Amino acid sequence: MIKTPRPRLCRRVGFQPGTTYFKPAGIRMTELKESVLLVDEFEAVRLKDLLGLEQEECAVKMRISQPTFHRLILSARRKIADAIVNGKAIRIEGGNYKIRAIKRLGWRHGKRV
């Protein structure tokens, strides 16, 4: 019997980046190497480093375990550091994710909630 790996769960992302490509100045596109940052890695950096949330809270928001979040943030930081230190572009794309639903105001029994 062949063991197959457990399927990856979809991670929840609360923000779709508007800009998906960052390039260092002074290097031609033809000479440029890239680091690809997955959208779920981008979300991990946004939650932890930009918003300053605790890892447990970030993991809950993304609907993943805390150890999985830890691996995700380490991978993202490594890719960002590699791009900055080695003069690479950063492309944000791909990954296994769904955009988190945004709660909106609604109507209930003729009254605004």
Where are these regions (language model features)?
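Short, Lys/Arg-enriched N-terminal segment that forms or immediately precedes the first helix
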Residues: G18-K33
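Helix-turn-helix/homeodomain-like alpha-helical modules used for DNA recognition
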Residues: K98-V113
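Residues within the DNA-recognition helix of helix-turn-helix
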Residues: L72-S75
